[in-house]
């Protein structure tokens, strides 16, 4: 029967959320956040995994793992991070986004290209 073959094709995920979408909003911009998977750590903190992207009109950030705090509108990553803006490229070992996305600290081994 085809049922056994179909059962083998089903992928079981440990994620609480598949393809989560969030936004950080401040007075001047919105930063949209997407990922492939997410897990609730508590009421406000969500662990975002796999292909995590932050996108605004001014910049984008890509990494693999982020802890996003919905209440405080903050994000933190300890994985390889790629930042891109019109005249700036930054590669770092992680970042800390706070003040509703107005401030971003990049840390670890960082490589900056200014055009």
For the regions a language model picked out, list residue spans one by one.
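Mature-chain termini and adjacent capping regions
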Residues: 1-115
């Amino acid at each position: 029967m085809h049922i056994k073959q179909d059962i083998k094709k089903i992928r079981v995920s440990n994620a609480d959320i598949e393809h989560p979408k969030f936004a950080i909003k401040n007075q001047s911009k919105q930063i949209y956040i997407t990922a492939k998977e997410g897990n609730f750590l508590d009421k406000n903190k969500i662990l975002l995994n796999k292909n995590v992207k932050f996108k605004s009109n001014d910049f984008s950030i890509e990494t693999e793992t982020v802890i996003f705090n919905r209440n405080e509108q903050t994000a933190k990553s300890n994985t390889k991070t790629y930042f891109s803006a019109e005249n700036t490229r930054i590669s770092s070992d992680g970042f800390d986004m706070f003040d509703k996305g107005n401030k971003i600290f990049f840390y670890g081994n960082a490589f900056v290209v200014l055009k």
